[in-house]
């Protein structure tokens, strides 16, 4: 959500119009698996031609740097670090200045929560559907164990506290508990 809602403008969204090939490149930025595949001579030539033609040159140079200067991993790490920071503080700065990429964005927890609102509603519905499928009422649930990186996001903790007795919502290590659960299931011989 951070990339789509806040960072695509740095790569030309909103300034590049009526050029489907360029728009496709810009919209590929959130897909970390697709980005390295874009570093072809044809795409480089397309970007350079658009830059020479004056199509959002600063923004497309930033996109070119991201794709061709092997900066995707650093970029996605900055985004992930911002999400982690917003779990414990009200704002953070996404900053990446290297090899032709000059990106700086102040990002607040409020913006983040607005950006993930649709996802939060979907997750809440999945939780409610899961409880309903269990045949239990929320008050009958003994413990709700928060797991995974997103479980540290305050909006999700608040949602769980609304749905269940907050005393029953248990924090776990968000990064190792999923792995531990899989190991337990594997040891029990269950198919995953």
Segments predicted by a language model, with ranges:
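Phosphate-binding glycine-rich/basic clefts of nucleotide- and phosphate-handling proteins
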Residues: 1-98
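Conserved phosphate-binding/catalytic loops in two-lobed NTP-binding clefts
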Residues: 139, 157-184, 191-192
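Short glycine-rich phosphate-binding loop at a beta-alpha junction
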Residues: 17-28, 131-148
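Phosphate/ATP-binding catalytic cores across multiple sugar-kinase/actin-like superfamilies
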Residues: 82-85, 115-140, 144, 185-188
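Adenine-nucleotide phosphate-binding core of ATP-dependent small-molecule kinases
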Residues: 64-72, 101-130
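Glycine-rich phosphate-binding loops at beta-strand->alpha-helix junctions
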Residues: 67, 71-72, 138-160
């Amino acid at each position: 959500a951070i990339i789509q809602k806040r960072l695509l403008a740095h790569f030309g969204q909103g300034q590049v119009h009526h050029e489907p090939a360029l728009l496709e490149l810009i919209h590929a930025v959130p897909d970390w698996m697709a980005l390295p595949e874009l570093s072809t001579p044809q795409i480089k030539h397309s970007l350079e031609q658009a830059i020479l033609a004056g199509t959002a040159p600063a923004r497309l140079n930033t996109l070119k740097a991201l794709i061709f200067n092997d900066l995707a991993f650093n970029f996605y790490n900055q985004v992930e670090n911002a999400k982690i920071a917003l779990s414990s503080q009200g704002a953070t700065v996404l900053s990446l200045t290297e090899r032709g990429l000059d990106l700086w964005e102040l990002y607040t927890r409020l913006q983040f929560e607005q950006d993930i609102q649709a996802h939060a509603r979907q997750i809440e519905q999945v939780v409610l559907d899961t409880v309903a499928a269990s045949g239990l009422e929320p008050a009958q649930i003994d413990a709700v164990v928060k797991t995974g990186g997103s479980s540290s996001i305050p909006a999700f903790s608040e949602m769980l506290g609304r749905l269940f007795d907050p005393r029953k919502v248990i924090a776990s290590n968000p990064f190792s508990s999923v792995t531990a659960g899989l190991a337990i299931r594997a040891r029990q011989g269950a198919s995953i």
